[in-house]
Amino acid sequence: MKKHIISIILLSAALPSWAQDHAAIPQLDDNLRRLVAPYQIEPPKRTVGKITLFGGSPESPQSKTLIIHPTDTPNIFSIRLNDGESERVSLGFLGLWEDMDIEYSDPQWVFRRKLKGYSQDTLWQTAPAGTQFGYSSSTKTTISERGKQNDMAQPASDENQNYIRYSCAIKREIPARTLHKNIQGSAKEIRCIGSENSNWLGLTGYYLADYHFYIPLKLLTSLPSIEKWSITEFE
């Protein structure tokens, strides 16, 4: 018995820090699972546990780290993001493609958003370059000041207040190692615009086919600056 305990301790010490920080596998509620069930594909060939990004706006570049764990449902991941100033925890469908349940907090505020509706008109996950598609989502949002409660969620009869539709296109498919030397397989470059946000001119991201994980890397807005990110760690 003592040998087994020592072996477990040694094994834990040999793991990277993100792997040691692994609580019980999150259990999804049935409502979230049903929202994406029509768009599910087979489980990914490969897994990723940690991604570090560097960039943002040229005026104030920063680094942010994502710690990723599987859940009890394929292609839905538990993601903890830390940028050094704040932390958010979310459940993401296909990585950062769609936040299903997200909590963000700082010293003063707690922000919570839960996915209430989701649809896409094409199974873009397996579609070739050149494919155009749309998807939409609706969410319920709660913002509370620490020590107070201020529910800003729209009433159930008026969910369209938090409804948005996106128009997207798969522009090309590239070797994933172009983004980082550790990434295997191919990556689809996807560009989207949000029809309900006039300031949001476009988002470019990459879907890592072997990992079933989407990462947004460039945001273009009507403001002077452009947010651009690069992958500095992938393990």
Task: Cite the ranges covered by each PLM segment.
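Mid-length scaffold segments of soluble, non-membrane domains
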Residues: 115-162
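Short, linear, compositionally biased motifs with a strong N-terminal bias
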Residues: 10-11, 129
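Acidic, serine/threonine-rich low-complexity disordered tracts
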Residues: 21-109, 142-235
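Boundary at the C-terminal end of the N-terminal hydrophobic targeting segment
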Residues: 17-19
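Sec-dependent signal peptide recognition
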Residues: 2-8
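Short, intrinsically disordered low-complexity segments
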Residues: 1-2, 112
